[in-house]
Amino acid sequence: MKKIGVILARLQPIHNGHLALIKKASEENEEVHVFIGSADKFNERNPIPINMRHDMAMAAIVERGIKNVSIHWLDDLDDESNNSHDWGFYLYSKVVSEIQQSNFTIYYSDGFEIITSWFPGFILRNNVSLSLLARGAVED
């Protein structure tokens, strides 16, 4: 089984915090999969279209020489404020469908309570692990 890191971010726009997470995940995994959330949204909260977010992310990743990263688009389940188990199952199924593996590590910078609310305990115990990069640990 491959060691796979997963990052979920809207990238509105991509910034040093996102890149630090991607770099950390790249150093610790064989593959990193970045899922750009709210891919189906183009509004005041999501003013940058998904194709631009994708292109900016790829350019920043390549510019920094970060390897083994794939980028995927992820539509919202319904409302981006949905932090239910429905969202967790939706996210988990989308990730597993893309990476073809049921075990992975989610890299995040805040919101532990939110992330853990997405998944029933059995998924966190058996399939998904979490890795924190505190916002204060990010260099400008």
Protein language model regions, located:
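Nucleotidyltransferase catalytic core that binds NTPs
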Residues: M1-D140
